[in-house]
Amino acid sequence: MIQNSFIFLEGIGAKREKEFWSNGISDWDRFIDCEKINKISKGRKLFYNRRLGEAKKALFGFDSSFFNILSHSQNWRLYDFFKEDAVFLDIETTGLDRFHDDITVFGIYDGLNSKTMIKGINMDYDLLKKELQKYKLIITFNGSSFDVPFINKRCPDLLPKIPNFDVKFLARYLGYQGGLKKIERDLGYQRPEIVNEFNGGDALSLWKMYKATGDEYYLNLLVEYNELDIVNLKKITDILVSKIKGQIFS
């Protein structure tokens, strides 16, 4: 989808982009090959050609950082190309204040395997930083508002400077309301009963119970809750990206 995108070009919005598609200018190569395009001056066309050439070089050089020029709401366009090099990420914390609260659980999932780091047990930010360098796209739910700013404040330079595809934006655009678990249910997914009704507040309570009692039962529930967030996020992402593409090209 990213190679069909022109919305990152200066002065090109969604309406103009759709006009390109309607006129057969469906990807970067077709745009560049056109000698002239209606309503675009010769000088502007040359500028756009250079910009698309830069985008193409970055894409096939797997330099996803180039596409930080996209707005958060448009990062879904990167998913098809970078999904094999994407990481689904979710954190649990002691509260919402990134200036004073801490990260208790850090979960990541590459689409095949999940990894969990826990405060006071196996949390190793050097190892985590090395692991995250492998990826080209970070995928979160509400991460642009919470997870990423929280991590950047508590652990500066931990995250690579790559785009964050916050699936919440895409879900809202497609008409899905509520949090991740509500959207899961709307799409037919059901979590195990013991964690089905958990929310962020319950995650904090589980951490507090674990710290107060030392009973790993509470910790295991918290880890399961976090892992389901990232594993199910991939399922939801696959569905929602397919839906938005179907809408655009229908």
Regions picked out by a protein language model, each given a short descriptive name:
Residues 1-82:
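N-terminal accessory regions of nucleic-acid-interacting proteins
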Residues 24, 155, 240:
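Active-site catalytic pocket residues across diverse enzymes, especially alpha/beta-hydrolases
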Residues 27, 124, 146-147, 229-232:
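Short phosphate-engaging motifs
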Residues 67-137:
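Conserved RNase H-like, two-metal-ion catalytic cores of nucleic-acid enzymes
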Residues 90-92, 147, 166, 229:
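Acidic active-site catalytic centers that drive phospho-/nucleotidyl reactions
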Residues 100-101, 151-153, 238:
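Short amphipathic alpha-helical segments
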Residues 105-108, 112-190:
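Conserved DEDDh/DEDDy metal-dependent 3′-5′ exonuclease domain
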Residues 188-250:
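Acidic, Mg2+-coordinating catalytic module of metal-dependent nucleases/exonucleases
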